[in-house]
């Protein structure tokens, strides 16, 4: 409250708390009201924003609170969590939109530290595509698991610079001891990759470098295939020759019965690893397949937020289109854990929960931003949803499995898919 009073942007008018001992009391000059009074308080105090200051609440309780606010003409935002405040990662006046996990309605599963450590602790780890959405989050989590050295590999100078700077701040702030190396390069340069593996004696590779925007790859087929297919082939072959212990491909649900070039390129990348795994290689190859990640550069969430900020409309391809979703930290955490389970050629599939209709996600985001979607609402308080049609190669619904055979792994969120594969010599012939 004191932080809000120091600025001009916010004018606090009332507290709302479900603690009956606090209700009807006055704190710092503000009345403490009951949650059920909020609908009446909004017009009474001309409230335009509600700030959630419940950092210790359970995910279930947070969702209950957010659901109760969805229908009100207010913008719902949040303050940082206790853990972020204690770690110095945020300050109390850093108010932001609600967490993506709250939009999703998923409860994060506590990680199994022993799995994360198996491929990382005291090892030299390399991440390709280190500056991307998934790659950068893998790096953030890897540095906290005590690697001997982390090699960042990316073809984008700015992305590489940004993640290196961020990681050095994390390392310094947490007093971590590890070497950090940032290397510019392309996964399409096989000699460069093998040289890097050998020079730094890389033990574990997380291959996150890929073009993932479906429409972009659809219109840039040659580059998409060169990067996603041949880049994976070169990276994996170089790992095999250099004696890398573990090579993990970050894959996608779009690789299952693909209807677009991006999905087909990722399925070919999977087939390369499945084939290589049968070559008596010293390298343990595996792949982790999951759906969309909220907040990534290819996600609808940043697009929807920008469209809402601009006053709409919010564009959705089809009323029935649905996708599996997961937050970036959760996806990265599960990739690190799955990589420790592979024996060779494993296809791991993450439990993505129930698919989410994109139009429902759009409606929730619009309402939590304080706008209405009803046609009879005033134009100044309404954001329209516009259906623009499925894009070339786009499915209504995605799948995570090629067949129906899957087995558990001992981790509630990670399954092993039992799928057919082509012998490596046949894969090579197709690629050549």
Can you say where each PLM-predicted feature lies in the sequence?
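Conserved Rossmann-fold NAD(P)-dependent oxidoreductase catalytic core, especially the SDR/UDP-sugar
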Residues: 88, 207, 211-270, 275
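NAD(P)-cofactor binding segment of oxidoreductase domains
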Residues: 63-79, 149-156, 198-199, 219-246
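Hydrophobic/aromatic anchor residues within beta-strands of the central parallel beta-sheet
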Residues: 182, 224, 285-288
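Flexible, Lys/Arg-rich cytosolic regulatory linkers and terminal tails that connect or flank
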Residues: 23, 30, 35-36, 62-124, ...
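A solvent-exposed beta-alpha-beta segment
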Residues: 1-87, 155-164, 181, 185
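Strand-loop microenvironment adjacent to phosphate/nucleotide-handling motifs in alpha/beta enzyme folds
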Residues: 110, 117-119, 241, 275-293, ...
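N-terminal Rossmann/SDR dinucleotide-binding element
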Residues: 93-101, 105-201
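Proline-aspartate-enriched helix->loop->beta-strand connector
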Residues: 42, 46-49, 147-148, 197-206, ...
């Amino acid at each position: 409250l004191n932080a809000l009073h120091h600025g001009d942007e916010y004018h606090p008018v009332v507290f709302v708390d479900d603690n009956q001992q606090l209700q009807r009391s006055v704190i710092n000059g503000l009345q403490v009201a009951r949650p059920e009074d909020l609908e009446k308080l909004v017009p009474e105090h001309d409230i335009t924003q509600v700030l959630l200051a419940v950092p210790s609440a359970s995910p279930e309780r947070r969702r209950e609170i957010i659901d109760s606010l969805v229908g009100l003409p207010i913008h719902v935002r949040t303050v940082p969590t206790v853990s972020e405040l204690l770690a110095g990662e945020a300050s109390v006046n850093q108010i932001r939109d609600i967490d993506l996990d709250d939009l999703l309605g998923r409860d994060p599963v506590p990680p199994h530290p022993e799995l994360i450590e198996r491929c990382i602790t005291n090892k030299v780890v390399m991440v390709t595509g280190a500056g991307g959405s998934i790659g950068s989050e893998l790096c953030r989590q890897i540095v906290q698991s005590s690697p001997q050295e982390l090699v960042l590999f990316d073809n984008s100078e700015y992305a590489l610079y940004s993640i290196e700077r961020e990681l050095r701040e994390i390392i310094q702030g947490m007093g971590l001891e590890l070497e950090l190396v940032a290397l510019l390069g392309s996964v399409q340069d096989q000699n460069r990759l093998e040289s890097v593996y050998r020079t730094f004696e890389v033990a574990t590779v997380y291959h996150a470098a890929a073009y993932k925007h479906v429409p972009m790859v659809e219109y840039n087929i040659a580059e998409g295939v060169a990067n996603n297919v041949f880049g994976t082939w070169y990276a994996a072959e170089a790992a095999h020759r250099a004696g890398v212990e573990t090579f993990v491909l970050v894959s996608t649900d779009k690789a299952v019965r693909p209807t677009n070039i991006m999905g087909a390129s990722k399925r070919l990348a999977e087939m390369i690893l499945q084939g290589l795994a049968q070559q008596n290689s010293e390298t343990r190859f595996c792949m982790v397949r999951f759906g969309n990640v909220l907040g990534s550069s290819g996600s609808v969430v940043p697009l929807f937020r920008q469209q809402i900020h601009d006053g709409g409309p919010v564009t959705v391809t089809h009323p029935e289109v649905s996708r599996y979703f997961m937050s970036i930290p959760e996806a990265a955490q599960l990739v690190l854990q799955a990589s420790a389970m592979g024996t060779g050629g494993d296809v791991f599939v993450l439990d993505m929960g129930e698919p989410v209709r994109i139009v429902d996600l759009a409606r929730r985001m619009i309402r939590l931003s304080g706008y209405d979607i009803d046609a009879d609402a005033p134009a100044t308080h309404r954001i329209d949803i516009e259906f623009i049609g499925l894009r070339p190669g786009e499915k209504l619904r995605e799948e995570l499995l090629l067949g129906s055979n899957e087995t558990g792994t001992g981790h509630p969120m990670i399954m092993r898919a039992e799928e057919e594969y082509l012998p490596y010599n046949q894969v090579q012939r197709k690629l050549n």
